[in-house]
Amino acid sequence: MVDPLCNYNVLEAIFSYLELSDLSRCSQVCKSWYHFLNDENSDVWRWHCLRKLPKESIKSDLLASVTTYKTKLRAYLHAWNPNDCSRNVYIKPNGFTLHRNPVAQSTDAARAKIGFRQGRHAWEVIWEGPLGTVAVIGISTKEAALQCHGYVALLGSDDQSWGWNLVENHLLHNGDMQGNYPLLNNAPKYQVGERIRVILDCDDNTLSFEKNYEFLGVAFRGLPAKKLYPTVSAVYGNTEVSMVYLGTPLDG
């Protein structure tokens, strides 16, 4: 009779060296493999996490909302794209934080590595430096511009992007102000370091936000059936913005 522990160790060794795409297929082979890979804190996911993520990120407070090795790895794979941002932006070694260089008369944006056209998705945005005169968070398609002259609300300036300007509490799309947000009397302004949760519902075609675990309401409706990417645009020199993908939002 084969020792179950032996089987476990063999599977662990094999799965630790497979590509992530192969692990997804392996989980569909049988119930045993599915349950094995469903343990998000197993040594398999720990190994892949250690192999992919910068060491400084794994135990960082930045990832406090993603508590397992698998969710940390998923967040990293969904983080800012160093190849899809303004030339005045670079992604820091932790992989989750963008830094805007102090370039005068420029507005600069960055998109995430992965966009969505199906399902429900949530991510956190943390502005870790001064906002400046304009600081916008939201979504865009691949067609939206990532750099322009001057200090403007770049995200939301065309029909390919939708944003919330944290400085003035305005919603922006197609170059127009779509209204105040949130719809509260004397709505408090964003404070540097606060975590804002962005919720994209591709099934209902809506974009919403939460702050301090309070749902702020639906910001945009009627979003197009296109792949939409987490995006921010910034104007302040040396400001930094982090983004952590959370997965499917929990209702309530």
Swiss-Prot record:
Pathway: Protein modification; protein ubiquitination. GO terms for cellular component: cell cortex; neuromuscular junction; nucleus; pole plasm; SCF ubiquitin ligase complex. Pfam families: F-box-like (PF12937), SPRY (PF00622). It is found in: Synapse. Residues 1-48 form the F-box domain. GO terms for biological process: negative regulation of gene expression; negative regulation of synaptic assembly at neuromuscular junction; neuromuscular synaptic transmission; positive regulation of protein catabolic process; proteasome-mediated ubiquitin-dependent protein catabolic process; protein ubiquitination; synapse assembly involved in innervation. The keyword Magnesium does not apply. InterPro entries: B30.2/SPRY, B30.2/SPRY_sf, ConA-like_dom_sf, F-box-like_dom_sf, F-box_dom, FBXO45-Fsn/SPSB_families, SPRY_dom, SPRY_FBXO45. Keywords: Neurogenesis, Synapse, Ubl conjugation pathway. Residues 58-250 form the B30.2/SPRY domain. The keyword Cell membrane does not apply. SUPFAM superfamilies: Concanavalin A-like lectins/glucanases, F-box domain. Its main location: other. Required in the presynaptic motoneuron to down-regulate the levels of wnd and restrain synaptic terminal growth at the neuromuscular junction (NMJ). Component of an E3 ubiquitin ligase complex composed of hiw and Fsn. Belongs to the FBXO45/Fsn family. This is F-box/SPRY domain-containing protein 1. It comes from Drosophila mojavensis. The gene is Fsn.
